[in-house]
Amino acid sequence: PFELEREPAEAPEEPLPAPELHSLYHREHSGLRSKTLPTLRIALLGNPNCGKTSLFNQASGAHEHVGNYSGVTIEAKTGYIYYGGYRIELIDLPGSYSLSPYSPEEIYIRNYLTGSQRPDLVLNVVDTCNIERNLYLTLQLKELGLPVVVALNMFDEFMQREEYFDYPRLSRLLGIPMIPTICRTGLGLEALFDEIISVAKGIKAGDESLFSPETGK
């Protein structure tokens, strides 16, 4: 199993930014303007109870049920936000511990991530308090070759344990951006979506299949 060296922290005094959430996700792009924005399809994926659906609700303004029992997210939920000049489609996939095709949820997720409608990027939400267990799924996503950004969620609870790990170093080792978040309040989401836009812009510059103007409804 993946293990991290933990040590008592000289933790940063302000580990998370505190943005005004309402200023982040502009939903004023209505009518024809929204239909001409480039679309970025992002799949939300993480272990059960990692805070993934809380992130979905905070970002999209949706009110999906959030609970601590199996089967809360039994199918993909979709929400939309407009940020950084893009129309972002958020797909909240079922919670899963792995991509091994054993359970119906795992088969559904793997087929979605590798099929013709696969997302442009995967936002992997992890419970920072259980980082080793959560990284198993992260490494499987990396093996699929999809662009990944990690939200280190519940970072406040992790810091309360007076532990710290060098997540910038881990990010460099894995080649995956990692951003601390507190999804239930929205803290860290501005930095997270800025990173997502940055990664998306850097993916194969000139690849027209990544961003396609919205031509639907």
Task: Label the model's feature ranges.
Residues 60-61, 145, 175, 186:
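Glycine-centered helix-boundary capping/hinge motifs
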Residues 212-217:
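Extracytoplasmic
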Residues 70-77, 89, 101, 105-108, ...:
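Helical mechanochemical/support elements of P-loop NTPase systems and associated helical scaffolds
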Residues 156-211:
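Canonical P-loop GTPase G-domain recognition
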Residues 2-103, 115-121:
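Conserved G1/Walker A P-loop phosphate-binding module
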Residues 79-85, 108-179:
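Conserved C-terminal guanine-recognition region of P-loop GTPase G domains, centered on the G4
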